[in-house]
Amino acid sequence: MRDLPGLPSRRSFLKASAATAAIAGIAGAAKAETKPEPAALTEYKPDCLQPTEWAFVMAAVARLIPSEGDGPGAIETRVPVFIDKQLAGDYGKASDWYMVGPYEPAASPLRGWQTPLNPLETYQQAIPVFNEWCKQTHGKIFAELDPETQDKALTSLQKDEMKIKPELREFFSILLANTKEGYFSDPMYGGNHGMAAWKYIGFPGARGSYKEWVGKHNVKYPLGPVSISGERG
């Protein structure tokens, strides 16, 4: 095809179009990767936890993974948000668990979940019981205690010194497990904000190629983590 004088050639037009599309794609990707900061925990509106339950979760995870360590704490990584969202979803309802009796609360933990209560119901029933025990033992509900007393109260819960009813005996275990999960999960689930926990331990996240590093030990990984959604830390 002959190019007309004074007009751009077909080849020049295609080159310019390709360059424009590439630039637009880069700009669009950069814009897509820029996400607004989520609401502060003090302003966050829980999906399922009631105010007293939310206050307990906030206080409890802050003691299980405290902020005063050499890495980020549970509050900085938004673990409470992860727990709230998990309890509001299939996990909280035990949607894909076998929940048909009989139940034997005194059975070994190796025999699995031995209560008719799902995780959300366990939180909902255990928190008021624990708060009442804290009031009777320490004078205030858990969230209002000082950090040292909170640690003592959580230790009592862990050791079953308060003799919580058998149906709720898994409460501390799932609270601790959910806290760990929220700390190390992919940010898409609400916790591990900014991949701070992954950065702290040097975990590469969901990188597409990691084979060349599988056999390398005691060598610091030089690149930051990548989330499932493609965010880079």
Indicate residue ranges for each PLM-predicted region.
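Short N-terminal segments immediately surrounding and downstream of signal-peptide cleavage
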Residues: 35-49
